[in-house]
Amino acid sequence: PDALQQLLQADAELDGQYGWLSSRALAPDGKDQPMNLQRSTPYKDLASFAGPRQPAVMASFVSLFLRSSTVQHFGLPIAEFFIWSDDWEYTRRISRSMPCYVIPASRVVHAMQNATVVNIATDTPDRWPRYRYFYRNDVVLYRREGLRGWLWLIAKDAWHSVQVLRHGPQ
């Protein structure tokens, strides 16, 4: 019930000198929501929720706190990204220029119909066309990371291809 209060307290402590603040998103059973884990690098989920704040570079829009001046400076999320990676692109755009943080004491419950990590190999066939946007958006997002981003994309897409071949419909 005090998630917003925790974000406002962090805002005051940081004197507005940050890009965004993010809450810890939990499932109704109290476990972390895998789809809403923040990233400490573009390639690695946040390892710990210890301490008053954890630096992060990407976050979900679930309980994301931004100052209006940040939105005015960086603009809005890319509208065409809607469905997948719009939040990661936007938060990464901001974190390239400003420090950003997860505030572990700020906790929200995010009930989702499907709380698993996105995986084309295990998803239902009626959702497969949506993955076009997932992969397109990832290319835009990770190419901004230079050579390492391209290598990440190649490795991730190769892994997804192997999963589809192993687990996809026969």
Predicted regions and their residues:
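A recurrent flexible, glycine/aromatic-enriched loop bordering the glycosyltransferase active site
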Residues: 46-66
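Active-site donor/metal-binding and catalytic loop motifs
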Residues: 103-123
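Conserved donor NDP-sugar-binding/catalytic core segment of glycosyltransferases
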Residues: 2-35
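Alpha-helical elements of Rossmann-like donor-binding domains used by nucleotide-donor carbohydrate transfer enzymes
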Residues: 2, 6-9, 89-93, 137-140, ...
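A short, conserved alpha-helix in the catalytic core of glycosyltransferases
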Residues: 64, 69-75, 80-106
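Non-catalytic, C-terminal membrane-associated alpha-helical segments of glycosyltransferases
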Residues: 129, 133, 146-170
